[in-house]
Amino acid sequence: MFLKLFLLLSLVSFSHSDSSSTVSCPNGTDFHQLTTVFRYVSGFNSSWFSSNCSAVITHVVLPSRKLNGTVSWNPIRNLTRLRVLDLSNNSLDGSLPTWLWSMPGLVSVNLSRNRFGGSIRVIPVNGSVLSAVKELNLSFNRFKHAVNFTGFTNLTTLDLSHNSLGVLPLGLGSLSGLRHLDISRCKINGSVKPISGLKSLDYLDLSENSMNGSFPVDFPNLNHLQFLNLSANRFSGSVGFDKYRKFGKSAFLHGGDFVFNDSKIPYHHRIHRLPHRHPPPVRQRNVKTHRTNHTPLVIGLSSSLGALIIVIFAAAIILIRRRMKSARTKSRWAISNPTPLDFKMEKSGPFEFGTESGSSWVADIKEPTAAPVVMASKPLMNLTFKDLIVATSHFGTESVISDGTCGPLYRAVLPGDLHVAIKVLERIRDVDQNDAVTAFEALTRLKHPNLLTLSGYCIAGKEKLILYEFMANGDLHRWLHELPAGETNVEDWSADTWESHVGDSSPEKTNWLIRHRIAIGVARGLAYLHHVGTTHGHLVATNILLTETLEPRISDFGINNIARTGDDTNKNNVEFDVYSFGVILFELLTGKQGSDENVKSVRRLVKERRGEEALDSRLRLAAGESVNEMVESLRIGYFCTAETPVKRPTMQQVLGLLKDIRTVSR
């Protein structure tokens, strides 16, 4: 028993520390990288891992933890010692980066029973064109078509069952060391012959596809196989008694046009072609009765009663299973609440909280219940600062979404299953409380489809906290620069069309119409702010949140006006907002971050009438005739980023120009 417990604990490569404390590790540590990976995933709790900042993570094993959301894969690159990755049986979505398979130490990956999609192939990393992965389980997901296993030379176990591959994955025939292969229920059409050279297989499941081929000549060496399932396919061929006895009748059931040609096989098991789905009609015999005989009647009634009981029992079982399945489905697709940490609540303040950057902020109040949370969107909610502490696990690192220049941003689930983002405004600590309340109340009244309106606020001592609706799709910066191409959050799998055949990108990112719509939305929201006499002052891609339909919503507007300092004098005006929008437009069109260097480079290309060279290659490949629209949009960005502020257009003019681009092209 002790040995089993030890093996179970060893799945995580380092021991858990005391979860009663919240530790903030430097950015370069494995622990920090891991919390960043799951920052947009509901239900993740960093206390599952050691908070020892010097610990090295080799195993990430989190099966059946009710995780829900999109994994931010990029930080996993920095877990250089990672060997085992198991996120099975959760509700994670998106696609997998192609560089994942080239991580040198990664040998076992289990991502089964999630909602992952996209392509699977090895992309060279640091000169390596091969994958070290030996065991790979991607069953019960959403993978389609773009699958290539040419570089997976070390694979011994591969399970791709219950996906929608459509065709046999490329490169399977070259996996000489493969011992276990399961591609059942993958909607595969075509011949089985490409895998006939797999000589090491001892397990092969091809069931419930539409594959064809001649048995046994088109199949791998059957002498080494211990398990075989060819049922529900379109195969043909001759099955001898040795194969029948070894694999059983079920291996060939509905498998195609098989001939069982050995007299030792029972006659009723010799299936020559696909069996009928319904039994043949039973001929009724004429029965002559010369005298009354109650025995047949009793037997008939008994049989009928027995059959009725069996039918009722079977119906009850089916009903129970359907209800259980429905309950499991609802549980799986529901957004799970972050698991609260066991922490000790100080009886009296001040309360100090660490951040990812290593700094800290202090709520200098004696009682956490003394600071109310004012919810403009739900005025009847009775919340206090204590509720925010509990909802964020003591403002722990596992609840951090980001830690930017304005202050840390946390994810929380308040009573009533209200998902919110909480930002600590470090820059306005010294602003008078009454002035802050006046400003917050004014901001809660600004409502527009492209603004992320302030939901509420809390003032705890000098600390000012604001609450927004939580946006699970994250921000524009993350969507453009951090997420792997091919990501999809499409709920209807049967109609999932996000796969792309242009490189490794999805139509979400290669679609100019979507990026143009985002630009229009941001311009519309900013124009509204200027119309009501408010400026943003710090418009960047991380302050533009995306809804489930990729509709943009601007956040943090008006905050710079509260924290007016000498350094911000030139930023609290509409001209600076217009410049910032031009940078955003450049990011949307080039796919590059809006650094000063990139802005200068794009402006130079536009000025030299070489704007097409600056466009994101993913857009150019997929756009076709829309290239002219994108080049014209670059010119709008050029006007917005004019060095002389007075030469910049107004946001209302910018909005009109962006709308005209699509109107003229049509």
UniProtKB/Swiss-Prot annotation:
Catalysis: reaction(s): L-seryl-[protein] + ATP = O-phospho-L-seryl-[protein] + ADP + H(+); L-threonyl-[protein] + ATP = O-phospho-L-threonyl-[protein] + ADP + H(+)
A Pfam family it matches: LRR_8
Induction: Induced after P.brassicae oviposition.
Presence of keyword Plastid: no
Tissue occurrence: Expressed in reproductive and vegetative tissues, with higher levels in seedlings and flowers, but not in leaves.
Keyword set, alphabetical order: ATP-binding, Calmodulin-binding, Cell membrane, Glycoprotein, Kinase, Leucine-rich repeat, Magnesium, Manganese, Membrane, Nucleotide-binding, Phosphoprotein, Receptor, Repeat, Signal, Transferase, Transmembrane, Transmembrane helix
One Gene Ontology cellular component annotation held by this UniProt entry: plasma membrane
Membrane topology, Extracellular segments: 18-297
Disruption phenotype: Endosperm development arrested at one-cell zygotic stage. Increased resistance to auxin (e.g. IAA and NPA) and osmotic stress (e.g. mannitol).
Activity control summary: Not stimulated by calmodulin (CaM).
Subcellular location: Cell membrane
Residues of the Protein kinase domain: 395-661
Residues that span the membrane, as ranges: 298-318
Family: Belongs to the protein kinase superfamily. Ser/Thr protein kinase family.
Protein name, entry field: Calmodulin-binding receptor kinase CaMRLK
Source organism per UniProt: Arabidopsis thaliana (Mouse-ear cress)
Lineage of origin: Eukaryota, Viridiplantae, Streptophyta, Embryophyta, Tracheophyta
Gene encoding the protein: CAMRLK
